[in-house]
Design a protein with these regions (language model features):
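Extracytoplasmic/periplasmic ligand-capture domains
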Residues: 61-64, 89-119, 128-130, 191-315
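Surface-exposed binding/hinge segments that line
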Residues: 77, 121-171
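Sec/Tat signal peptide C-region and signal peptidase I cleavage site
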Residues: 18-24
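Bacterial N-terminal signal peptides that target proteins for export
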Residues: 1-10
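A structural "hinge/loop" feature
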Residues: 34-49, 72, 148-157, 189, ...
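N-terminal lobe/hinge region of extracytoplasmic solute-binding protein
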Residues: 30-80, 110, 187
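Short, hydrophobic/aromatic-enriched beta-strand segments in well-ordered soluble domains
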Residues: 83-90, 135-144, 204-207
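A local structural motif
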Residues: 25, 69, 84, 125, ...
Length: 315
């Protein structure tokens, strides 16, 4: 059995919290946005994924040192460059007490490959997935894929029975505004389950008594997510004690928060690349009044690059 720290479960880049709590039973957590949907395959977006990770798990995950670690799979191997064999944990249950088996993994990977899934590009090389037995899954790729484990760390496993019962076998079409049961309800194998959902206001997570893991910070039995869009208001809520944990504190406020004896600033590495994209193809920009598209000119793109203070970003 593996021990997980509460912060590892949140899997965030930078967070500040009230250090005097040593963590109470209920943690009030805030960030800028809320989850767009509870469907774990519908939207690949920061706050949405953070919420999903409290409830759902994948075959593998990344540790705090960014290495690939077992999660629902205990081990894996390749029999040839295009064939992967995953051995699953045999003590995993969903939060309703039902067992997780290879049929749930097969269902989830195929669901994540659907047209409406926002995670389909992660597993675009997966050409087949098969349950060898209750706790063995074979994944076949159309070509060698050395980063498949990294990609599978983002594919959350759902209960096939729960999805079929609630007409949620297809990933929510979020772009079309589709409303589905899986968009407003969640049931996974993770350390928490959702007991209250008020979008953009409050989401309550309670400990999943069926979780296979062992939470080191076992005093935490409940988490209240309270999204606060305005950065200044969010920081004020932290400093006043209205919330205990903020996972996206503004950089300019970190020194002030850290100077408080009642608060602590922690940071971890993360697998994320932020980039600036420019439309170099269109003759005219979709917005603005510049006339011809300036980004078609190499000199303009170079000027934009020179204007970026890279050293300041590094700091």
């Amino acid at each position: 059995m593996k021990t997980f720290k509460f912060f590892k479960i949140l899997l965030t880049f930078l967070f500040v919290f009230v250090s005097t709590q040593s963590f109470a039973k209920t943690i009030k957590w805030s960030m800028q946005g809320d989850s767009l949907t509870l469907d774990p395959h519908a939207q690949n977006e920061g706050p949405t994924t953070q919420v999903s990770r409290q409830v759902y798990e994948a075959l593998v995950t990344r540790g705090l040192d960014m290495t690939i670690e077992p999660q629902l799979a205990t081990k894996w191997s390749t029999t040839d460059p295009n064939t992967w064999i995953f051995k699953l944990r045999e003590d995993v249950k969903f939060s309703d007490g039902s067992k997780m088996t290879s049929r749930d993994v097969v269902f989830s990977i195929l669901r994540a490959k659907q047209r409406t899934s926002d995670f389909k590009e992660y597993i675009s090389t997966v050409s087949g997935v098969e349950a060898i037995d209750d706790y063995t899954v074979k994944v076949t790729t159309s070509k060698p894929n050395p980063i498949l484990l990294n990609q599978l760390s983002n594919i959350f496993v759902m209960s096939r029975d729960w999805s079929e019962k609630n007409f949620a076998v297809t990933a929510q079409n979020w772009d079309a505004g589709q409303e589905t049961f899986s968009a407003t309800n969640a049931m996974g194998t993770g350390p928490f389950k959702i007991t209250l959902r008020e979008p953009n206001t409050k989401t309550v997570f309670k400990r999943n008594k069926h979780w296979w893991g062992d939470m080191k910070d076992n005093k935490v039995t409940e988490i209240h997510l309270l999204p606060i869009k305005n950065a200044a208001t969010r920081v004020a809520a932290l400093l006043s004690g209205e919330v205990d944990l903020v996972t996206d504190a503004p950089v300019q406020d970190l020194a002030r928060i850290g100077s408080s004896s009642a608060h602590k600033v922690n940071s971890t590495a993360q697998m994320r690349t932020i980039f600036l994209g420019m439309d170099q193809a269109a003759d005219k920009l979709r917005t603005g009044n510049t006339g011809d598209n300036p980004f078609k000119k190499k000199e303009v793109r170079q000027a934009l690059y020179q204007a970026i203070d890279i050293e300041a970003i590094k700091k």
